């Protein structure tokens, strides 16, 4: 997935390089399919699409449901209000740990991680655990001691680790999120929004290890060196009774209330839901996820090779080169939506042309909003036309 910054650079390149844009608008019927990301990027971050549908009635102070693959917003309610996030903080803790360290690296539990306030897996000073084991302790039992151990082992202190969490949030383009610790105990300088927590979660779900851990109902790790002696149970009730549920994290403090981030896959759709300060999070998430699966579908936009453009080639052995989409494309859209396809095609390209190069773009729109852009790649290499004896001497 391209970052917002890279997308802006891409649009600038298109504006500079495309002298003449030819637009072809065609209606595409919507039907089920599966997303393939190669050569395709949805408009995310600042360009993320919000379908403008209010979340179903629920008791949460803030709520949002997004398409995990694109970040497009399916439903939301007060999604940009800053709130405490309790132990859903640990999603960022896990993300940062997975990105910065070998999961099989073994650590000795530091003294700072023993007896930490709140939920605990009762770590003992000096006991050996791998990062993988600590991550299971972190995400299943929500161990604040595990969060502290990860922070101290990877960054030297919880304070330094929190600063790294803030740097990662900044990289993700988040402007309303700040971390003061790795575990989520209430702090006035520790907050996020439902929207930005959903973005963090979508980023974390890109990693197979993270997905594996948050989908696990129960697990065993070492306890003070004894294999499989520490029994862990996931606190996320949705994993035990909701069809397709595969993550991610619960949270609670007296100040922040009950927080929950959940995810589920069904019928080709991959959905993330977030609620902050909700007295009935499990019930709310069932309602939100049901509404998403009932109202949206993974819509097939184009089969592989279905979108084509012919581009004139200057000084080429062939006068034209064909460009097409190398992968099929599907997107999570409201049921019954119809899309428009616009082609961005240069007036011409110069030889030589290399097979597989991006030469044009296809833009899909729903109700006038651009929802994804697809690279159209050349299907053949075109060599530069050899000049005749007279052309070499006298020019064209």
Residue ranges and their predicted role:
Residues 1-11:
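N-terminal Lys/Arg-rich, disordered targeting/topogenic segments
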Residues 2, 32-195, 199-208:
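Active-site-adjacent loops and short helices of periplasmic peptidoglycan-processing enzymes
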Residues 10, 14-15, 51, 58-59, ...:
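Generic detector of short alpha-helix boundary/capping microenvironments
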Residues 10-32:
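Sec-dependent N-terminal signal peptides of Gram-positive bacterial secreted proteins and lipoproteins
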């Amino acid at each position: 997935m391209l970052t917002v910054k890279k997308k802006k650079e891409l649009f600038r390149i298109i504006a500079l390089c495309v002298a003449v844009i030819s637009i072809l608008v065609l209606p595409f019927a919507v039907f089920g399919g599966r997303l393939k990301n190669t050569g395709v990027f949805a408009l995310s971050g600042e360009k993320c699409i919000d379908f403008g549908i209010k979340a179903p009635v629920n008791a949460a102070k803030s709520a949002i449901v997004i398409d995990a693959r694109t970040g497009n917003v399916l439903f939301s309610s007060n999604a940009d209000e800053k709130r405490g996030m309790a132990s859903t903080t640990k999603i960022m803790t896990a993300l940062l740990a997975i990105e910065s360290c070998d999961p099989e690296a073994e650590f000795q539990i530091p003294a700072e991680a023993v007896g930490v306030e709140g939920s605990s897996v009762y770590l003992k000073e000096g006991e050996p655990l791998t990062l993988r084991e600590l991550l299971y302790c972190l995400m299943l039992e929500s161990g604040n001691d595990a969060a502290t151990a990860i922070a101290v082992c990877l960054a030297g202190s919880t304070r330094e680790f929190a600063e790294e969490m803030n740097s990662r949030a900044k990289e993700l383009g988040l402007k309303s999120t700040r971390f003061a610790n790795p575990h989520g105990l209430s702090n006035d300088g520790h907050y996020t929004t439902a929207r930005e927590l959903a973005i963090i979660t979508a980023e974390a779900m890109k990693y197979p290890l993270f997905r594996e851990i948050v989908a696990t109902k129960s697990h065993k790790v070492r306890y003070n060196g004894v294999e499989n002696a520490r029994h862990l149970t996931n606190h996320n009730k949705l994993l035990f009774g909701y069809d397709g549920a595969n993550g991610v994290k619960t949270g609670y403090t007296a100040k922040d209330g009950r927080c929950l981030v959940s995810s589920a896959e069904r019928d080709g759709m991959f959905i993330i839901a977030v609620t902050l300060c909700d007295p009935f999070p499990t019930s709310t998430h069932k309602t939100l996820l049901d509404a998403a699966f009932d109202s949206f579908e993974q819509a097939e936009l184009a089969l592989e090779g279905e979108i084509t453009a012919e581009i004139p080639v200057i000084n080429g052995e062939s006068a034209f080169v064909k460009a097409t989409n190398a992968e099929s494309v599907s997107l999570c859209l409201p049921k019954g939506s119809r899309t428009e396809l616009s082609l961005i095609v240069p007036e011409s390209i110069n030889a030589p042309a290399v097979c597989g190069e991006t030469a044009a773009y296809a833009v899909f729109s729903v109700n006038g909003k651009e929802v994804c852009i697809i690279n159209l790649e050349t299907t053949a290499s075109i060599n530069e036309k050899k000049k005749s004896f007279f052309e070499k001497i006298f020019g064209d």
